[in-house]
Amino acid sequence: MNGLDIEPAGLQTIMVTLGQNTPTIAYTATLAGQPVSVAWSVDRGDLGSAVAGPASSTIVTPTGGTGGMLTVSARLGTTTIKRQVFIQLDGGTQNGASMNPLEQQQTATTVAQLGQGGGIGGVGGEGLGGAVDASTLTALATPAGNGSVQMLSFLYPYDATVWPRGMLAPLLMWNWSQGDADAIQIELLTTSGSYHWKGTFAKPAVLGMTGAPTTKFIRSPIPQDVWATATNTAGGSTPNGKPDQLTVKLTVAIGGQGFGPVSQTWSVAAARLTGTVYYNSYGTQLVQNWSNIQDTAGHYIGAAILGIRSGDTGPHLVVGATSAPTDDSGCRVCHVVSSRGRYLIAQAEQPAAPNLDVTSFLYDLNDANPQATATQFTTNGTFAWAAMLSDASYAYTNVIEPSSTNPAISATTSALYAFGAPPGSGVLAAISTGLPTGVGAGYPSFAPDDQYLAYVDATGTGTNTQNCPMNVAAYDAATQTFSNVKTIYTPPMGTRAGYPAFLPDDSGVLFEQEVRNNGSDTVMVTRSGERSQIEWLKLGVSPMPVVLRNLVGIGASGSYLPTGGNQHGLDNTGIEAGYDDTTLDYEPTVLPIVAGGYAWVVFTSRRLYGNQCVTEPWASVPTAYNLADPSQAPTKKLWVAAIDLNAPAGSDPSHPAFYLPAQELDAGNSRGFWVLDPCKTDGTSCASGDQCCNGYCQPDPTMPASLVCSNTAMCSNVQEKCTTPADCCDTTNTCTNGFCAGIPIQ
C-alpha cells in the first residue's frame, strides 16, 4: 500500500467492566508499508484515551466509565485516517444501595428528609432500599408472571421520553393491584449493547417510620451514579447507525413471588442542558413573607423567585426575602429573565400603595448576591412580564395583567425601553418602535437571536384578551425598530392564546391555547379551573397550529397520562367532567440554544406527578395545606420536553415530558425560564462551550481529562460557538443561534 494506513482497519469491539481500563487496543501507522510517526487523538475523552505521539503506534485505553463508539484519528500532514472502537460497558449488578456518595444522597434515614429541598435525590419518593434476601432475589430473577394480571404498569416516567445528559435520575413510579411490594429489580440496557446494569432493592426502611407519608413501596429512584453512566453512554453513534436508546425494565416482588418485567424505551440527547431555570414559587420554605398568613399547620408562607441548575437536588433563593409576619415586602414572584441569563426583572409587593405589585426592580444575575444589585425603575407599573432582549439592553413592555386580581400594569400601550448604559443604571428612555401607533402587546417575547418579537395584540381590549390575535414582527437591533408585522394565529372564538416562545432557530413558535376559562379571570391564568394546552406553528409557511400531543400526554389511542382521583381523569365531576390531565399545561418558554439536536421547552403543568404529587389540580394555595407534608404536595410543577427541529408544518415535533428535578415538593411552582448562565472566563472549568465567554470548552493543557473555557480551537464542537456550519468540527452540524448543534440519530 502506497498511502497512509492504520491497522487494525475494521471496527474493534471490546467488552469493558465498569471501572476497569482493559482490554486495550494497539494501533500502528504505516506509509508505503513502512512505520511512520503520526499524531494520535480520540474524539471522546470520556470513552478512552490514546498516546498522542507523534509515534508509529499507540495504545487506546478505555476509561471504564462510559460505553459507546470511540473514534481514533491518526494525522500525518494534511491527511487524517479514522478508526472506530465500540466499547460495551458491563455495569454489573448490585443488591441494595451502595456506599457511593451519590447513592447515599438517595437514601433516606429520617422522615424529615423526605420533604427537604427537592425531596430525596431531588425527585421525591423515599429513596433507595437496602439489600434483598436470597429467596426474594430468586423470585425477582424468575417471576411468576409478567404482571399483566396484576395490572403492573409505569406511572412515571413516560415511554419514549427524550432525556438530556447531566440530569438527576428520575423517580420510577408504578401502579398495580397489589398496592405494595417487598422488593424490586431495575434493569438498564442500551439497544446497541453499549451498556447493561441490573440492581435489586428492598423496601426502604423509612416507610416503616412514624410519620412517613405512606407505608407502601410504590416508587424508587434509579441510582444516580448508574443513571449518569447509562445516559452518558446512550445517545451516541452505533455500529449499525441506529439510535442507541435506553431501555428500563422493572420487576416487582411481593409475598415470595415476582411479577414483570414491564419496560419502557427512552431516547437520550447527546448533550447536557446547562444554565439555570428561574421560576415562581408559592409556598417555598426558603423565605417567609406573606403578612400574618400561615398554612394549616401554622407555618408562615413564602413566595420568591428560585433557581435550579442541572444537577442540583434543591432550588436556591434568587430574589425574595423573609419579611413575615409583619409585612409582605419581601415577596418577589412575577418575573422575566434575559435569555443570556444576565438580568432579571421582578415585581414587588407594596402594601402601602393603592395597588399592589406595581414597583419593578432589575437584578444582576452575574453577581454572587443578585438581591444586593436591585435597581428600582423610575416608572412603576411598566415592566411586569416585559420582553427583554438576550443581553437585557432593551425591553418591550407588556399590557396584560398577570391576573385579574394582580394589577401590575398601569400602561395600555407598549413601548421599547432602553435601560441605560450599563443596564441597571435605572435611566429609562422610551424609544420609537416602528410598530403601529398605540399597540398594546400582551405576553411579548423576543426570539433568542433578537431578530423577532412575538406578542398577542391586545390593543384597546383593556384586561380581557379573549379573541386577541398573535403577531410576529421583525426587529432590527441596529436601529431598534420593528417591521413586517404579521398575524400568525387567531384563537378560536371565545378563547385566549398567549405566552408565545420562539424555537432557538426561529423556525417556529410555541404558545399556550386556552381550552376552558375558569369563568372569573379575563386573562390567562393557571388556577381555579383554567385549562390549557401547548401548541406550536411553523413560521415561514402558511401557519398551521398543532397541539403538541406528545408533550401534553396524548398518544395514538388517547391520553397516556396516569389517571387518578381528585379530578385527575378517573372520577371527574361537575365542571371537570370530560376533562383529563392533557389540558393542564401552561406558560411555555424555550431554552435559547439547541442541545443534543433538540429544542427544550419548560412549562407549568398541574398533571399528576406519578403517585408522588396527587392532590386536586387547583389545590396549590399555600394556606390550604401543610407545607411540610409531602403527601399534600400540590401538582403545580415545572416540566420539560424535547422538541424536534426542522419538523414539517402541521406535524407534532414534541416528545413526552419529564418532571424538572430539584423543585420543592410542597410548593406550587410555575413560569420557568431556562436561560444561559453568565459566561465563564478562559481557564474556568466548563462542561460545554455555551458556558464560556469566548465560546469554547476544550481540554485543559495541564490536565487533558478536564475541560476549561478557551479562546482557541481548531474547530467547534457541539455547543461551541460558530458563525456558519463550516465552523463546526462535524460537517453534519448546524449553526443555530451562534452554536454548533448536532442532529439526533434517527
Across the structure, where does each feature detected by a protein language model lie?
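Secreted, cysteine-rich disulfide-bonded mini-domains of extracellular proteins
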Residues: 679-746
